[in-house]
UniProtKB/Swiss-Prot annotation:
GO terms for cellular component: mitochondrial inner membrane. The gene is COI. It comes from Planctoteuthis danae (Oceanic squid). It catalyses: 4 Fe(II)-[cytochrome c] + O2 + 8 H(+)(in) = 4 Fe(III)-[cytochrome c] + 2 H2O + 4 H(+)(out). The keyword Cytoplasm does not apply. The lineage of its organism: Eukaryota, Metazoa, Spiralia, Lophotrochozoa, Mollusca. The keyword Hydrolase does not apply. This is Cytochrome c oxidase subunit 1.
Amino acid sequence: IFGIWAGLLGTSLSLMIRTELGQPGSLLNDDQLYNVVVTAHGFIMIFFLVMPIMIGGFGNWLVPLMLGAPDMAFPRMNNMSFWLLPPSLTLLLASSAVESGAGTGWTVYPPLSSNLSHAGPSVDLAIFSLHLAGVSSILGAINFITTILNMRWEGLQMERLPLFVWSVFITAILLLLSLPVLAGAITMLLTDRNFNTTFFDPSGGGD
């Protein structure tokens, strides 16, 4: 139900983007609002539709089935992973509602996420939302990797694994490699905004 709701919300945001881009004039009449819609649409579709439904729900059922395993390696970890997502979505929606919201460039171009561009807590709320979603993804990735490595039936060698299982396995490994980098970057962004550090300050030289 949570994933379906997130999917409907993401689809409605996607339709807003397509409508804005599909006609010559401006529909929303606000570039910042459009940027916020693009950002929220991406986060909602990835973290709250694809992750819990396609990977969390469908993958948790199909991967053990393909491995001949009775269940995932850590069944309760799925619950922990899922229940981090509703507060994450709440924080993301709160970030879009506070002041002018968090626009598209704030994760890519640090000056756009400075206190001058976003004086209020919208970027901070988006960062905390990403932290929760990232922890949820890491828990799920650990569960999948452990399941694929340790829960195969005795005759199932790695080279005989179905391609779907391999795709989940490789994706989980890449996720574990990339997410800590993102977490470190947005944490440095958080300290720049709130503790006067100069990680992303061109004049400060970095801490």
